[in-house]
Curated annotation (Swiss-Prot):
The gene is RPS10. Its main location: mitochondrion. SUPFAM superfamilies: Ribosomal protein S10. It is found in: Mitochondrion. The keyword Transferase does not apply. The lineage of its organism: Eukaryota, Viridiplantae, Streptophyta, Embryophyta, Tracheophyta. This is Small ribosomal subunit protein uS10m.
């Protein structure tokens, strides 16, 4: 039975997402997610000059990784992910396991 490890990585630094996971297995899919951009406008002077403003932006880059693995290798892959130093990034790990039930056994139980 195959198990999929799904990882969503959010970072402010784009080169981080491109170069950090260099040791990924060949059966890994990288999917780019849409970037989000937040723009903040701040008044430079609080008194007279209303037109004098300064803008700051915050861009969040996202990447979606899917690693296909066998069920008995799941622990090894998870510890490999924990050892990866993901400084400057926020990540979410989801495990997806598909099991197959035997139809004959289920009918005998009912």
């Amino acid at each position: 039975m195959t198990t999929k490890i799904r990882i969503v990585i959010r970072s402010f630094d784009h080169p981080f997402l491109e170069n950090h996971f260099g040791g990924l297995p060949p059966y890994t899919w990288k999917i780019g997610l849409p970037e989000s951009r937040v723009l903040y406008t701040v008044l430079r002077s609080p008194h007279i000059d209303k037109k004098s403003r300064e803008q700051f932006e915050m861009e969040i880059k996202k990447k979606y990784l899917v690693i296909k693995t066998e069920k008995h290798e799941l622990r090894k892959k998870f510890f490999w992910l924990k050892r990866q130093r993901l400084f400057g990034a926020q990540y979410e790990i989801l495990f997806f396991c598909k099991t197959r039930s035997d139809k004959g056994k289920l009918q005998r139980l009912l």
